[in-house]
């Protein structure tokens, strides 16, 4: 028995191609949140229909950070990363939180 999957493009507009970004699911608001990567330190949300850029201000640009959802506080937590992907000595140790409206 084999399965056949059919993919459908849901949105024509969204984040530019990138790598080194972080992405996590925000359960309280049922959104996928994408931050940063190689291109820009911007924040995007996917609501199962469309991508929306939601924040221009926030953590400085970085690659390879980690982001998880804290269910008890209903916030996304972003940690670390590097300023230059080819220079791990430029590692960051800061922590940021996304509450669905702004980074702090």
Where do the protein language model's features map onto the residues?
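Kelch-like beta-propeller repeat domains
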Residues: 1-104
